[in-house]
From Swiss-Prot:
Gene from which this protein is expressed: gatA
PANTHER family: GLUTAMYL-TRNA(GLN) AMIDOTRANSFERASE SUBUNIT A, TRANSAMIDASE
Subunit relationships: Heterotrimer of A, B and C subunits.
Keywords per UniProt: ATP-binding, Ligase, Nucleotide-binding, Protein biosynthesis
PROSITE patterns: AMIDASES (PS00571)
Assigned EC number: 6.3.5.7
Protein name: Glutamyl-tRNA(Gln) amidotransferase subunit A
Length: 484
């Protein structure tokens, strides 16, 4: 259900907001045992928030912009008084004493908090298979993964278990699962949205963003949660435009760049390639000018990312030692042994792997060869984007090289798993806004996503193109069929 449909239900007066929200909880109770999108539900909070909106309605008072909209939050974003676990044994019992800036803004805007969604442990993964709460299933085929790390967020929207979900994107963790689950996923410009209350993975790459059923819903959520935050020094002090105002603007004459390196990559599935190229033809028919552009270092992004991100993760996760923060092992005779056992038992294999990679790349004698070199390549990738945006307004790629893969296919093959992020990590390295929208289906009936990348703070541009395509292509009408 998109926002407008939900608002019509509220306006009709056939049911109160509280009754409509309880219908969502009934659906979650029925379907989520098969999907496993949620790590916990917040029924008491949702009922209290719903009653407040119902009171405003009964008093004919002005409603906040997201009044009554049911929203789920990824379980690495702090929500006051609710467990924020990062889907890890390390934080399984951590109850946040404060509200993240993003969730606080959403509740102030009238959103209703349904619960927390599943993710790869500490947001490190592309399949939501490394969670301490178990694997999340893709609503289009429950034998397949939903993507990751925001797999629970994407699956909850696709399955109709919320109207919107909030995820985090470090190397594609909003866009890749959005592509796999056939929904809209938006990663804003780095600094557009506050990271206060987001449990850090890689601080120079992390960004919070929405996953929704439609582009206009994503625009609404982005507007509500954007803006300067004194609690986050990396948050940009720039005016927040009304992202809805340009959604229906004609794209006639808009220059869209097709990144050649993406479409020529040997790992790109042919069905994905043909579907995205068909979408390019549709955009051309709608008046856009299509140009081939080169980003020579685009495909170097994945190697660059998997040096920088683990380095930052190894520093960010050093605090979890069982002393001040995180799971603490029992029965140890000394402090060193306790810390060692707590981290070994509290972190899963993938998190430990990335900590080891990062620690090695930052160690004496190796930081020049790995970390500093990766940062130089990151700068070159950003310069490639700058050159491309001198010629075009928006860049277009497939979101992922493939559609959703089967559970277990790559869990023991990390290098193959990492390639799922091949086409999404460059936007994070450059701090650029990017959106994934559905553009078709493969022969197995699995969703295919296309990615639009904009220049810094040009979310309005990619939202405009995405909305025009969405309305013309009408891909979103097709929904997964889930048996209870």
């Amino acid at each position: 259900m998109n926002f407008n449909s939900f608002r019509k239900e509220i306006k009709s007066g056939n049911a109160s907001v509280k009754e409509l929200i309880n219908e969502f909880f009934l659906k979650i109770d029925s379907l989520d045992p098969k999907i496993n999108a949620y790590t916990c539900l917040t029924k008491e909070i949702a009922n209290s928030q719903s009653e407040q909106i119902d009171k405003l309605i009964s008093n004919n008072e002005q409603l906040p912009p997201l009044a009554g909209i049911p929203i789920a939050i990824k379980d690495n974003i702090c929500t006051k008084g609710v467990v924020t676990s990062c889907s890890s044994k390390m934080l399984q019992d951590f109850v946040s004493p404060y509200e993240s800036t993003v969730s606080g803004k959403l509740w102030s805007s009238g959103g209703i908090f349904l619960g927390k969604t599943n993710l790869d442990e500490f947001a490190m993964g592309s399949s939501t298979e490394t969670s301490v709460f178990g694997t999340t299933s893709n609503p289009w085929d429950t034998k397949r993964v939903p993507g990751g790390s925001s797999g629970g967020s994407a699956a909850s929207v696709a399955a109709g278990l919320c109207a919107a979900s909030i995820g985090s994107d470090t190397g594609g963790s909003i866009r890749q699962p959005a592509s796999f689950c056939g929904v809209v996923g938006l990663k804003p410009t780095y600094g557009r949205v506050s990271r206060w209350g987001l449990i850090a993975f890689a601080s120079s790459l992390d960004q919070i963003g929405p996953i929704t059923n439609t582009v206009s819903d994503a625009a609404e959520i982005l507007y509500s949660m954007s803006g300067k935050d004194p609690l986050d020094s990396t948050c940009l002090d720039k005016p927040v435009p009304n992202y809805l105002s340009d959604l229906d603007k004609s794209i006639k004459g808009l220059k869209i760049g097709i990144i050649e390196e993406c479409f020529n990559h040997p790992g790109l599935d042919q069905e994905v390639k043909l579907s995205v190229l068909s979408a390019v033809d549709r955009l051309k028919s709608l008046g856009a000018e299509i140009h081939d552009v080169k980003c020579p270092r685009f495909n170097d992004g994945i190697a660059t990312y998997y040096v920088i991100a683990p380095c930052e993760a190894s520093a960010n996760l050093a605090r979890y030692d069982g002393v001040k923060y995180g799971y603490r092992s029992d029965g140890d005779t000394n402090l060193v042994e306790m810390i060692s056992k707590s981290r070994a038992e509290g972190f899963g294999n993938e998190v430990q792997r990335r900590i080891l990679i990062g620690t090695y790349a930052l160690s004496a004698g190796y930081s020049d060869a790995y970390y500093k070199k990766a940062q130089r390549v990151r700068t070159l990738i950003r310069k490639d984007f700058d050159s491309a945006f001198d010629k075009v307004d928006v860049l277009l790629t497939p979101t992922c090289p493939t559609t959703a893969f089967l559970k277990g296919d790559f869990i023991n093959d990390p290098l193959s798993m990492y390639l799922s992020d091949l086409l999404t990590v460059p936007a994070n390295l450059a701090g650029l806004p990017a959106i994934s929208i559905p553009c078709g289906f493969d022969k197995k009936g699995l969703p295919i996503g296309l990615q639009l990348i904009g220049n810094v703070l040009e979310e309005h541009r990619i939202l405009n193109v995405a909305n025009i395509f969405e309305k013309d292509a009408d891909v979103m009408k097709r929904k997964p069929s889930i048996e209870i």
